[in-house]
Amino acid sequence: YDLITTIIKTMKKLKILLFLCVVACTLTVQAQKQFTLNSPDGKLQTTITVGDKLTYDIHCDGRQILAPSPISMTLENGEVWGEKAKLAGTSGKKVDQMVPSPFYRANELRDYYNELTLRFKKDWNVEFRAYNDGIAYRFVSRSKKPFNVVDETVDYRFPSDMVASVPYVKAGKDGDYESQYFNSFENTYTTDRLSKLNKKRLMFLPLVVDAGEGVKICITESGLENYPGLYLSAAEGENRLTGQFAPYPKKTVQGGHNQLQMLVKEHEAYIA
């Protein structure tokens, strides 16, 4: 009788444990939310996942050309935009307008895209745009209080060992990224597989990754103001390119070519 009682008690415990496991797994799945944004012509698609991390991927004509890649921004107060983020709401819109371009070969350009804005608690947003020829995103603060950005996570993860054409920074020592931040942004392009890129050298933008079947991914940025430009580095043993950012200058002295440059002697513990 005691043995049967023990077995029954054990089975009850197992049922409770199994129930808790099922509940925990269900909550984990439910905690992740996915949003899909398509380009106006429907050929490009990005799926944004909100969970423990904030990630996005890119499909072109139904084929994945960028695997789920995490993005985040770390503030000086320790807050991280993009990790365990609490979604507050979403909104979307379609934009189709002409933009004046006095310094281009045409006097105006068509600005045509679909946009998805994810609003999070703690006063920040992420805006995604899907154009017919590209996907873009940016972080936006809703707070009126000033803040410093300590770091930003940019981590391009590719589904295979693709071929990339990249411009390496020529200046500075191998493996010493800080010494490479001071450069002229001039070099020829080197073409190789992601796994064979030089991991000791920074790469500047734009750079191109060949996704095959006539599709090429050009990585670049625009609308940059009061923020460091993005460098990329090759991650060890993986089909990844990770972001590197120069820290904000604290002390500068005049020097360089014909004393025309400001040389950074000390930097702050933040990037912007």
Regions found by a protein language model. Name each.
Residues 34-272:
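N-terminal accessory beta-strand-rich subdomains and adjacent acidic, glycine-rich linkers
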Residues 1-34:
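Bacterial Sec-dependent N-terminal signal peptides
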